Amino acid sequence: VLARKISVEERKLMAKTLAKEFDFKLYTISNTERFPEICNCGPVDFAKQAPLVFNGSKINIYVTPRAIRSGVPLRVLEIMACQGFVLVNYQEDLAKEFEEGKELVMYRSLDEMVEKIRYYLEHEEERQAIARAGYEKVIREYNYAAKLRKILEQRPSGVIQHMRNSF
């Protein structure tokens, strides 16, 4: 519960900061009336509209909830699969899976996030190249066949034989 509250407060601070400096749009069901500087576009139909938002946004920002300590957030993969440029808070597992600055971009503080937004808004070709490389990696390595192959490659010897004998 505490992690969720901290995440909410971090996201509010981020949204308010970005709304003051950039053409920042938020797509959420959350009530933001107390924050008139935030442009809340409301929720989108995930299947129909989210891919258009992810692809059409110059920069998609993802803030990982504090309760999530490991793994690759599904939302990051969804953005990348739509050829969207993603700016996400630093996470060790993301750094292991993706080449920072080549397939996605990570930040470690609100100040660094703002700096990187400024930079990538001014460097469109670089931003598009990162989005394209991220898309290619997700399509190539984050599908069921690739994941199953990776699981089978990492299995202890004898597991497949045990599974065959079990059925």
Per-region residue spans from a language model:
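Nucleotide-sugar donor-binding catalytic core of glycosyltransferases
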Residues: V1-R69, F85-L87, Q91-L94
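Short alpha-helical segment that forms part of, or immediately flanks, the ligand-binding pocket
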Residues: P51, L74-A81, A95
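Short helix-capping/hinge SLiMs at alpha-helix to coil transitions
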Residues: R69-S70, H123
